């Protein structure tokens, strides 16, 4: 039995408290969080976890925030955090050196690790470039839908994601080898759009917003399947974030649009989103 399981009762209380709180209210290497509990948590992943431009940045190379959701979750769980999330990271950066000098993210996982969170996959299919490529200076029917020209030869999203899944499964298997007692959690992406876009407040047409959200949905489905295949746990943060996306009112927005209304990179979680995601992750880990 994993050592992590024996601490489940304490984690459950911490996770529940974190959710109640949120709903009610240097170099690119590893960054320890303030929490120094007996649990050791390692966070791997891309900008969805790193938090570019949110609060204080601990790494300019990786645009990593000290108040991102891994930090929020670690504090709620009373865990010591080693955060190696990095904006722009792909699955290749789990085992290879990003920019040629940032250590492979998996190097942060050691035999005494209790919890590992992994939030990655979207950059493998160039999701950031796809979203930005869908911004439109002109309203419908002027201009051209990005979906129409990006899928002119067919929508290759599913094939691309099918190629990413075994890479994530392999990464989780490597984590199990490096830290046999660790619980591994694959964390999905927040929901960006609901049924419609909100042009011109955000310059993406509804037809394209719906298509982009379908890609996020399919990415999350891929992560869920990868978790099932590798003995990890999938954490869904998309469903609870419905109504908090790009088009939400300022006070309830968790994800910023093309022109951020609070500190965050375009089309990335803001601090409210990081706080909410951190609480959701802590609650899921504590179950």
Model-predicted regions and their roles:
Residues 33-88, 106-107, 135-140:
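Serine-esterase "nucleophile elbow" of acetyl-processing enzymes
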Residues 40-45, 49, 81-85, 114-119, ...:
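Structural recognition of the beta-strand scaffold that forms the well-ordered cores
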Residues 1-16, 31-34, 160-164:
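N-terminal export and membrane-targeting signals
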Residues 190-287:
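Catalytic His-Asp segment of secreted/periplasmic serine-dependent ester chemistry enzymes
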Residues 12, 19-40:
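C-terminal region of N-terminal signal peptides and the immediate post-cleavage residues
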Residues 115-118, 140-178, 185, 190-234:
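Conserved N-terminal glycine/acidic-rich loop preference
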Residues 52-54, 99-160:
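Oxyanion-hole/transition-state-stabilizing segment in secreted/luminal serine hydrolases
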């Amino acid at each position: 039995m994993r050592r992590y399981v024996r601490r489940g009762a304490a984690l459950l209380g911490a996770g529940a408290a974190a959710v109640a709180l949120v709903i009610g209210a240097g170099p690119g290497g590893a960054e320890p969080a303030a929490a120094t509990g007996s649990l050791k948590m390692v966070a791997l992943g891309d900008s969805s976890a790193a938090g570019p431009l949110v609060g204080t940045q601990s790494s300019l190379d990786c645009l990593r925030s000290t108040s991102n959701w891994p930090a929020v979750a670690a504090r709620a769980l009373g865990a010591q955090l080693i955060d190696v999330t990095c904006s722009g990271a792909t699955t290749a950066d789990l085992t290879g050196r990003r920019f040629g000098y940032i250590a492979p993210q998996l190097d942060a996982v050691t035999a005494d690790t209790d919890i590992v969170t992994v939030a990655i996959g979207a950059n493998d299919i160039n999701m950031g470039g796809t979203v930005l490529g869908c911004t439109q200076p002109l309203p419908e029917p002027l201009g051209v839908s990005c979906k129409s020209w990006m899928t002119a030869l067919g929508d290759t999203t599913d094939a691309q994601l099918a190629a990413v899944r075994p890479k994530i499964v392999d990464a989780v298997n490597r984590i199990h080898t490096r830290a046999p007692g660790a619980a591994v959690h694959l964390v999905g992406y927040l929901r960006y759009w609901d049924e419609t876009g909100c042009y011109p407040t955000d310059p993406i047409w509804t037809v394209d917003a719906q298509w982009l959200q379908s890609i996020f949905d399919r990415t999350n489905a891929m992560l869920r399947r990868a978790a099932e295949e590798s003995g990890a746990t999938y954490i869904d943060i998309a469903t609870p974030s419905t109504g908090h996306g790009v088009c939400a009112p300022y006070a309830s927005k968790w994800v910023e649009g093309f022109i951020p209304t609070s500190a965050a990179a375009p089309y990335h979680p803001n601090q409210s989103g990081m706080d909410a995601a951190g609480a959701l992750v802590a609650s899921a880990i504590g179950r």
